[in-house]
Amino acid sequence: MENRRIIFMGTPKIASVVLKTMLENDIHVGLVVTQPDKKKGRKQQLVYSEVKEVALEHDIPVFQPVKIKSDYQAILDFNPDLIVTCAYGQIVPKEVLDLPRYGCVNLHGSLLPKYRGGAPIQRAIWNGDKVSGMSLMKMAPKMDAGPVLAQKEIEILPEDNSTSLFDKMAICAGELLLSHFEEICSGKAVYVEQD
């Protein structure tokens, strides 16, 4: 596979599954960007994000800006060909979005434009939806408003809850990215504007 300079940005478990899927399929990630470590529990011990744990297991450098809007020099210095995000947790500035030659793509846990913004998986459960899904989109300065490359539906079963749907979405996200990865990196991806 061509040596591409790829950054992965994400924080929770769903994102760690996507990162693992990329690595297991020989997609070399050269830098991981994730939220800063947080203190948790009564002893206030520092806890790493699930994405950071995967990065460290694979000896991938990790960048953890407190506010990416003002602290993104490490990303500029890396000069990526592609940035892949999934549940990163901060709005990525335009200076970063404009940098990679293949763009910045995001995996979002709903069938956009439905449930733009935070907690899309939980909102599908709360609203009693029968179907949800994953969207692969090109990032834009406005949250979850960029054009969509592909979507994959997931049936929500009566016994599903947020945890089980997160697990389904994580697998779906990795599969969706893999099925369109070469299309993205060849510059042949056709994105469709959202309604």
What are these regions, as identified by a protein language model?
Residues 1-195:
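One-carbon transfer enzymes
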